[in-house]
Amino acid sequence: GGNLDVQIAAARIDQFIGALGTTRSQLFPQIGYGADASRAQASRIGQPPLPPGADATFSLFQASLGASWQLDLFGRVRRQSEAVQAQVFASEQAQRGVVLTLVSNLATSYIALRALDRQLEIARATTANFEKTAHIFDLRYKQGVVSKVEVMQITSQVQQAKAAIPLFEQAIAAQENLISLLLGRNPGPIPRGKTIDQLLAPAIPADLPSTLLERRPDVLQAEQNPVAANANVAAARAPYYPNISLTGLLGTVSTTFSDLFPGPSRAWRAGGSIAGPIFPFGAVRGQDAP
């Protein structure tokens, strides 16, 4: 088991780390392969017509290795990577904040549990003392030392003290269930450690530097939000500039499988492309809008 909030925060970190890897992969060439085998029949009356005696049915085998690389000359991918990196760091700080909150809640809940334990001990001890006193009053009543009214008063106090015991027991069970929930476990008893008297708050030095505030997870998380926003703005402006790509293909083509890999069957292609907007009619500007 485990605390659900912590699990959600950890899953969010994994999500951004995966997105960071996907974004950064665009900085490198993309390499792939392909293979194809087919059987076809050509038209005998097509253009150009088949020569007399030629077989219209033929096989075609192809194998290729291709690569493409979109050059990030204007920083679109780098800015996107910066934005996702900031989101990764922010999500890590968010998880730290969740963990710190969980630890704080657990500590507070455990202290409350030990306080209830102490109250239950006091209630049981008080009940035992009242019962002893009631027994003494009963003996004295039989001896004619005290009145019936006094016996009834002490008996009422015994009943009141006893009535508090199940209330504390119910409160303890509810507090144990709360701690189990924070721990991500099924409801059940919580092992005890130090008593409430032994739980001392640590001494906090009076001269702590204010720079400690900069280490707070919520502060560090908030610092990354504008970093991610600025990087996203820069990435959104990249479509104003042209996209430049390089492509290459190396392969073989043959009508027979046995001739697929010898030198004469080899084929290759290399090229580049450039494309960019001229009249996007506000599409790019809309992406760039805050």
Where are these regions (language model features)?
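Transmembrane beta-barrel strands of outer-membrane/channel proteins
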Residues: 33-39, 246-252
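Metallo-beta-lactamase
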Residues: 168, 217-218
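Transmembrane beta-barrel architecture of outer-membrane proteins
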Residues: 60-62, 108, 153, 267-269
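Periplasmic alpha-helical coiled-coil/stalk elements that build and connect Gram-negative outer-membrane
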Residues: 77, 86, 93-208
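Flexible, solvent-exposed loop segments that connect beta-strands
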Residues: 45-53
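A glycine-/polar-enriched beta->alpha junction
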Residues: 2-7, 14-29, 43, 64-82, ...
